[in-house]
């Protein structure tokens, strides 16, 4: 795309603008140094206007730049509208009335249309400013592209170096493990741990059984059941799973209607020393057997009695 042809009016306009800025901001003043530097970077030159666009630049500008059309520039009707809006003449009015007011403003010369030469000159200045802005955009985008390409070019090298370092560390770690760990042949591993588990299980079973027998050695019932379990013979009839001696040791009275029945209950209680009642307790005529109850008792009809629930057990020493 060819460059923009600069006219004599535009050349004179740019020269006048540059002269006006330099007269207002003197170079002798150090405070104006930044303003003059910005003016030098942003002012429109003939080289900028003569620079042609490539096809890629035109495509990039069309895709990345928003097109805006200013319909109010050099429009006399817009100026008339601003005057009527300031007076409130268009409030709650129809479109026909508004158009008639525009015609009235032009006929009475409230506003005058801009000359075509003036509009063409203003458009030429706006086109020069737009091209300067587009050149600045293209230069900025080009710098960003080069910066991104250099960043992508250096990033794979650093990643390759990190991968090589990790690979070297892994190799050194594997080599150190291979040197530290001894190599065992299948012949060395044979026989290791074969009989240890069986011996430990047998020892644990024997220890558990001997401990259980020692704890219940005093009770003939437990001894009989242990002997039957060892010999593989268990009684066919129902057995009392609850520990009956515990209830008699703590003085808890159970009704005969709810006590568990067993065929071996009488023999077990007579044979076990813990369930035998001392004869000295029977000879004591002054002791009430009901006062020995610590907690609530159950009557024969199934009701719960709280009689003497707060009494404490009395120990009588006959000897």
Swiss-Prot record:
A motif (Su(var)205-binding Pro-containing repeat 1) lies at residues 220-224. The keyword DNA-binding applies. Residues 107-312 are annotated as: Required for binding to Su(var)205. It is found in: Nucleus; Chromosome, Telomere. Residues 291-311 have a biased composition (Polar residues). GO terms for molecular function: telomeric DNA binding. GO terms for biological process: telomere capping. Interacts (via C-terminus) with Su(var)205 dimer (via hinge and chromoshadow domain) and with moi to form the terminin, telomere-capping, complex. Interacts with HP6, which is also part of the terminin complex. Residues 141-163, 186-248, 291-319 are annotated as: Disordered. GO terms for cellular component: chromosome, centromeric region; nucleus; telomere cap complex. Binds to chromosome ends in a sequence-dependent manner and is required for telomere capping. Multiple telomeric associations (TAs) in the same metaphase spread often result in multicentric linear chromosomes that resemble little 'trains' of chromosomes, hence the name 'caravaggio', an Italian train. Signal peptide: none annotated. The gene is cav. The keyword Signal does not apply. This is Telomere-binding protein cav. A motif (Su(var)205-binding Pro-containing repeat 2) lies at residues 273-279. Keywords: Chromosome, DNA-binding, Nucleus, Repeat, Telomere.
